[in-house]
Amino acid sequence: MLYDRIIKQGTIDEPDGKPAPDFALPSTVNWMRALRILAEDEGIDFGTATASYGKEGKRKMDVRVENTVLEQLFLGLHHLSALDQFRGGTTAADYARVGVLAWYYGIANAASAMTAAQSGSFQEDHAGTARLWDEQIASRGLAMAPFSWRVSSLVEKIYKVEVDALRNGSAGKLQTRPSTKNDALGAAAGYLSGSAKWYAWKTEEDLKRERAFKELGVDSFRSKAARTLRDQRLERKPMGFVHQAARYRGKANYREALFLAYGSGTETILSGYVEDMHSVLKAFLAMAGAFARRKLGKDLWSEFVADVDAKKAFTTRAGDIWA
């Protein structure tokens, strides 16, 4: 009954019907599994990440910048601790939605810590955080795979070539649960391509509201002038991992009520989902912490880890992630 009402009859905000959750749920779960497989294959932990950042030296920072780095990492650790507790639950659908939110905000906090450590920069909105992390970290080769995956442009003919290179010949599909690295390459490439397509569409919709487009006197991008205007905008827009994470969080927050929570087969599809989110966030936090340690210096870092483990009110230990 509820499916027919929401999906077929619609709601106040979507009178033509909400999008059906059937297609989106497997791809949502499978992307996270693919990330976990690829991160584990890379062997990301604090030790390997610290070695990876061996050429990064301590940076002189204002104390408020140091405090921002530490604050954002602490927030990320708190979100990881929430996911750690969710792993002990018996019904994945009970915490899948809030789990996605904990996962995303943990990623965003860790990303903010990295950009603050790198350049003293900080953004308080989702789009700004994603843009800054891609600009300051990923585009400079300072992220470990699979978090380094990005496209340099939202022009389709450009990003498709870049996605295919990352796919590396894999036949893996986003709709199929990955079990090997080869499967995971294809699934992760599928989500990257889909995200690029979605951000390109969003850019087009935003452009339609701008004066430059309205002055063309058209309502689509079929004309040469409109396509040129669009491509100039798309060409200047890269997209990285935190962009993908922000889109992912949006699905859980805004898609529709049935997503992650309705249907007899949902619990089966969600099997292992929270464990995957926990594993991926743990790897990202380990990477971010290793980067921050190099920039802050070992003395302040050791003091931070010791203080957190002495005074934190939640469960997960900083020393288990960052030592």
Question: Model-found features: residue ranges?
Answer:
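Terminal alpha-helical segments
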Residues: M1-A323
